[in-house]
């Protein structure tokens, strides 16, 4: 797989100082010289048994490093939780406008918005922090959020089996100057790629932007824009490519056409994959839904949420929270099962700026936006659009996306089955960080 050029590839250099401590016995010549030079009458026992200062420094450094690791771990967990909460809130906003298939990346959008937040001040910045649910984390320091996202991206980029790459573009009108401080920070933490463009020549601008996106997404997103407003000053685009391979693939020879119930009255035929084996799952008695884990290589997982009854899938979205998902995960068991799962492909594009406004991020998209950390020309600047397009393809080998203790099995018994033959939700996350990569629902597997 070709790695996109804008993917951040970190290089970490750690310098370790080795300080040797000497243990001198009283019989050694060195010890004799040393002991004779001491004033025993004025020396207390504490002074005599005091540890070498260099050893104390080493111990203090190790303690500080341990505290730092513990702090970053807690902060990373909080970042993942808040990004998930942001994703669930955004799903509810999307559902108010759209009742069909859904696919988007909370992680990708959060990265893009935090990068842009580096260029904001005042109420504009506060609204972004609040809208992303990151206001508490941001209190630790002005660069804590960029640093945390950088660490997460380092984890992803170093895991080749994960098959994830993410990047961001800022298309800026040709007469717009970026402050050097912002440029350096955004490069350091996000590796964002800036493209100068003449928006007044809208057809040329559209062609250039679409060409960049085609190149970076390996042709998965061939056309992002149909038209562009010539008055535009800034367009922010982020993309996410995820080529996940199932840890245990489905056998294509078992895939057959089967019925998928769109609702109580309509049904269609879809290619239905099949596998029998050990699966991890649970059943939520309160919400009457099955939750099934489908693991990928590289420590990622698709969590499938299937309501017991066909027409109830939208009602679940009002209750999706980090705590609910964590409860599901804690109550899962692994056992032998039959799983029927449809092949599908999703391709969705969202005008995220309209959705972000509903989540309280309004000033950024208005004439009162404070982008003074981004440019000296900030008085005349506002963000015009924030777009995200995500492509997700699921087949026997796995997923291609662009934006327990084993139970005892009784011999010869028929294994239970989960048949995903009605609308369902899916959550794709990285196990180690618990970062929510993709979130969505499939209402009709035959429609993009």
UniProtKB/Swiss-Prot annotation:
Cite a single GO MF annotation.
heparin binding
How does it get modified post-translation? Phosphorylated by FAM20C in the extracellular medium.
- Kindly give the Pfam families that the UniProt entry links to this protein: Serpin
Organ and tissue specificity: Detectable in liver, but not in heart, brain, spleen, lung, kidney, skeletal muscle or testes.
According to the UniProt record, what happens if one changes residue 318 to A?
400-fold decrease in rates of factor Xa inhibition
Q: State any further remark.
A: Heparin acts as an important cofactor, producing 20 to 100-fold accelerations of SERPINA10 reactions with factor Xa and factor XIa.
Q: Where is the signal peptide?
A: 1-21
Q: Which residues are glycosylated?
A: 81, 184, 278, 299
Q: Where is this region: Disordered?
A: 33-70
Q: What is this protein called?
A: Protein Z-dependent protease inhibitor
Which GO CC terms are listed, alphabetically?
extracellular space
GO biological process terms, semicolon-separated: blood coagulation; liver regeneration
Return the annotated site residues (Essential for interaction with PROZ): 265, 318
- Which keywords accompany this UniProt record? Blood coagulation, Glycoprotein, Hemostasis, Heparin-binding, Protease inhibitor, Secreted, Serine protease inhibitor, Signal
Record site: Reactive bond: 412-413
Show the InterPro entries listed in the entry.
Answer: PZI_serpin_dom, Serpin_dom, Serpin_fam, Serpin_sf, Serpin_sf_1, Serpin_sf_2
Per its UniProt record, what PANTHER family does this chain match?
PROTEIN Z-DEPENDENT PROTEASE INHIBITOR, SERINE PROTEASE INHIBITOR, SERPIN
């Amino acid at each position: 797989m070709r790695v996109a050029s804008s993917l951040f590839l970190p290089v970490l250099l750690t310098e370790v100082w080795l300080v040797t401590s000497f243990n001198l016995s009283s019989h050694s010549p060195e010890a004799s010289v040393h002991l004779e030079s001491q004033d025993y009458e004025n020396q207390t026992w504490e002074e005599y048994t005091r540890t070498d200062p260099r050893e104390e420094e080493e111990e203090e450094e190790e303690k500080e490093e341990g505290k730092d690791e513990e702090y970053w771990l807690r902060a990373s967990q909080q970042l993942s939780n808040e990004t998930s909460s942001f994703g669930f809130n955004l799903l509810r906003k999307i559902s108010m406008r759209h009742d069909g298939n859904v696919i988007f990346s909370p992680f990708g959008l959060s990265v893009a918005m935090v990068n842009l937040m580096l260029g904001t001040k005042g109420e504009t910045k506060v609204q972004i922090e609040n809208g992303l649910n990151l206001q508490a984390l941001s209190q630790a320091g002005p660069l804590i959020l960029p640093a945390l996202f950088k660490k997460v991206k380092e984890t992803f980029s170093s895991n080749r089996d994960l098959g994830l790459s993410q990047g961001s573009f800022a298309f800026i009108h040709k007469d717009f100057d970026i402050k050097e401080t912002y440029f350096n920070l955004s490069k350091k933490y996000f590796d964002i790629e800036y493209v100068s463009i003449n928006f007044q020549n809208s057809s040329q601008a559209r062609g250039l932007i679409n060409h960049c996106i085609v190149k970076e997404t390996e042709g998965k997103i061939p056309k992002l824009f149909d038209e562009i407003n010539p008055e535009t000053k800034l367009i922010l685009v982020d993309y996410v490519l995820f080529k996940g391979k199932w840890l245990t693939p489905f056998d294509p020879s078992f895939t057959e056409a089967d019925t998928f119930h769109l609702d109580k009255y309509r049904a269609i035929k879809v290619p239905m994959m099949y596998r029998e084996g050990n699966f991890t799952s649970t059943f939520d008695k309160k919400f009457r839904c099955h939750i099934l884990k489908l693991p990928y290589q590289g420590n990622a997982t698709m969590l499938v949420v299937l309501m017991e009854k066909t027409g109830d899938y939208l009602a679940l979205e009002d209750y999706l929270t980090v705590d609910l998902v964590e409860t599901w995960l804690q109550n899962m068991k692994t056992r032998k099962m039959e799983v029927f799962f449809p092949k599908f492909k999703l391709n969705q594009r969202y005008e995220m700026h309209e959705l972000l406004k509903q989540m309280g991020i309004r000033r950024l998209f208005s004439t009162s936006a404070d982008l003074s950390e981004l440019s000296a020309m900030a008085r005349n600047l506002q963000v015009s659009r924030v777009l995200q397009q995500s492509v997700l393809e699921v087949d026997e080998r796995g997923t291609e996306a662009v934006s327990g203790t084993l139970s005892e099995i009784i011999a010869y018994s028929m294994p239970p089955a989960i048949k995903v033959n009605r609308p369902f939700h899916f959550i794709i996350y990285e196990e180690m960080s618990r970062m929510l990569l993709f979130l969505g629902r499939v209402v009709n597997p035959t429609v993009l």
